[in-house]
From Swiss-Prot:
Biased composition (Pro residues): 138-148
Chain residue ranges for the region called Disordered: 30-71, 93-120, 133-209
Bias kind Low complexity: ranges: 43-71, 191-209
Gly residues bias (residue ranges): 94-110, 156-171
Protein name: Putative uncharacterized protein FLJ45840
Amino acid sequence: MQTCSGKGIKMAFLDVQSSSTPQSLPLLLFSHREGGGRGAGDPGAPAVVPAPVSAPRPASSPARSESRSPPLTLISRHITCCSCESPGDVLLSGRGGGGGGGGGARTGGGEGEDRRPRPDFSRVTAVAIPGWMEVESPPHPPPQPQVCPTPSQGAPGHGRAGLPEGKGPGGRDWLRSQSSRCSRATLFGHRAPSPAAPRRGRLPAPGFPSLHSAVSLF
């Protein structure tokens, strides 16, 4: 948990979607007001107030400076309250409204703010001031292990020490070649070839006779 210093308005940019229009809105600016409890059981909790967001206008309409607050649904909830010094889910879904009655909410337009729509609305992507809010990304799923041939595969009844010699299926040379191909396939993101699949060198080229038919011509 990061230690936050300073008091006042603390902001974070969050990804949102509008429930009234299919077009995704840009970034919603949240202002963090200290004091003024949100719930009855926690009078000291800071209030999270959504600031007005400039609605996307059609290309044909003239530019206007006014802004309205469409219904907003927060997608990202992986964030930690930093001003109250305790981890918790302080983001609330609701209707964006005019600053909570003059509580110090500020609209967007500051330096470094990106107003372009973002294609991904699954997590918090930007923070206004680093160190004031700690962003927690969702945990990534563990990578699936690559299934590579082992000495027990393809050679039933043979242990690691009793492998049959030779280049046939189950032999040491065969397992070594399969393991090397498996590692190369894992490196390039492809699945390893199945042992039962024919080798590429044995396939005749399209439009040409096979080796046996070519030999039989002479």
